[in-house]
Amino acid sequence: ETTPEPREIKDFKASDISEQPFGWNVPNWLSRREISQALEAEPRVQFLPGVASTKLFTRDQEAKISLSNGTQVKARLVLGADGRSSEIRNQAGISVSTTRFGQKALAFAVTHPIPHQNVSTEIHRSGGPFTLVPLPDYQGQPSSAVVWMETGPNALALSNMPTEAFEAEMSARSCNHLGPL
């Protein structure tokens, strides 16, 4: 079996567009903690973690929102940050256009022998991108999160592979950029 070789390598440096980093990878738990603390400290925000909206009634000057804890709140601005199947968006009558690409994501974490140097790597091929996102070391080894986009049937086949075959396929798909995954 041959190892696929990348056809073309493009290095993107954030400094090409700014002296600031292009982005940061922030763990979800840290984002949630910091956002929660900031909201709790804001006197004009009523932060109700664990409480869902159940009904939205809008008028020109304000909206009335019924909550899962049995209360109601009034607001001049309602933000629907409740996911891709947003109930707030539906109740507000905001339509959505969806494009399906026939892809599924496999997401997991791996260790590897070559340090990632805090650099994300994305490899594009048919089926979708294969992305390595730096994570802190795990048990003394460099570690990365992987988001592997594939067509639905290929993603299913990959997820059903025996571990050894999957690891070989994963390392080949990464072009062994960080060594065997």
Which residues make up each language-model segment?
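Conserved FAD-binding catalytic core of PHBH/FMO-like flavoproteins
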Residues: 64, 78-181
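Conserved N-terminal helical subregion
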Residues: 1-91, 99-104
